[in-house]
Design a protein with these regions (language model features):
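Catalytic cores of alpha/beta
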Residues: 67-101
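Conserved, mostly hydrophobic/aromatic
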Residues: 2, 40, 48, 81, ...
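Alpha-helix-loop-beta-strand connector modules within alpha/beta enzyme cores
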Residues: 58-80, 117-135
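Catalytic domains of carbohydrate-active enzymes, especially glycoside hydrolases
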Residues: 35-51, 96, 168
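Glycine-rich, proline-tolerant flexible connector loops at the mouths of alpha/beta enzymes
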Residues: 44-66, 105-112
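Short catalytic helix/loop segments, enriched in acidic residues and glycine
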Residues: 14-38
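Conserved anion-binding
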Residues: 4, 10-19, 94-168
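Short, charged beta->alpha transition segments
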Residues: 33-40, 88-90, 159-166
Length: 168
């Protein structure tokens, strides 16, 4: 359940722009995020995710967050949440009903993997409630982890060694 500018959307990956709150849209739903959370719940689908696509600095962030919180209330324990998650706010989402928090940009800050930030997230929510998003884009024949709404490449190539290191 991707939420952008307070609406559930399917967007073209990598098209999000922080300036102007713009994205290329494939589809914009008329229903709320809570409606879709209810569908997940009625079909007994667990492990789906909610992604807040607006940064905290966006004028639409509060609308987007409100949609996310309503969805979590609709299906407590059934959905994960990501988008701007930090050790400081992760607990709020878990208390609201998220089963897990999803992080990328916080751990891969400025294109670099920061193990101390990963440890802080783990201390805040425990491994049991933490999902590390390893979304990638291909560059120069390798797949690099990307952050910040798929706009920024990290210096981390996704391979067996990377997965082994991060899972330990």
């Amino acid at each position: 359940i991707d939420i952008h500018n307070g609406k559930v959307k399917q967007i073209v990956g990598g098209s999000l722009m922080d300036t102007g709150n713009r994205a290329t849209e494939n589809f914009v739903a008329q229903q709320t995020a809570a409606y879709f959370a209810g569908l997940y719940q009625s079909k007994k689908l667990v492990g789906g995710h909610i992604i807040l696509l607006n940064p905290v600095s966006s004028e639409f962030y509060e609308q987007t967050k409100h949609q996310a919180m309503e969805a979590l209330k609709t299906y407590p324990g059934g959905l994960q949440i990501g988008g701007g998650i930090t050790p400081e706010n992760a607990g709020e989402y878990l208390e609201a009903g998220a089963s897990h928090v999803i992080v990328t940009s916080y751990v891969f800050k400025d294109g670099v993997l920061h193990y101390e930030r990963l440890r802080k997230m783990e201390q805040a929510v425990s491994k049991k409630h933490l999902v590390l998003d390893l979304s990638c884009r291909k560059r120069d024949g390798s797949y690099y982890i990307v952050t910040d709404r798929w706009q920024k490449y990290t210096d981390v190539v996704l391979n067996e060694q990377t997965i082994a290191e991060l899972s330990s």
